[in-house]
Amino acid sequence: MSDNEEIIKVIETLFQAGITKDIAVLRDIHLNDPKFSSFSDLPPYDLKDYQNTIELEELKFVSISDYSYEIKNPKISIFGDSAVVAMELNQKGMLVDTKAYTGEHMEIQGRATFVLVKQPTWKIAHIHLSKING
């Protein structure tokens, strides 16, 4: 498998967790290091570390039913053992409130930038998700 294929597979694994609800894989694809950081397209919008990112991704993916995503126009730039991936990202699903037994359809049209490092496999070192709608 080429580096480009491995990199896209890591990013797809992140979003596939929303479909499969296999959130254990999230710890495998993120760089567990103090240098890790992320910005989300959902609140809270502050800069997050590894642990907060994992917890919020787990919460997001278990709270959204019928989750789907589409990666469009990915641009992968590899610089030795680092890579930058920029893309358009569309996400849909039903945000479920299990206490109130209600659901709200959500759709996020956005952009995403990922920085990955190879140590020895590709891991996500930074995520920046942003909405371009609503």
Model-identified regions with their sequence ranges:
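A solvent-exposed, acidic/Ser-Thr-rich amphipathic alpha-helical stretch
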Residues: E5, I23-I78, E88
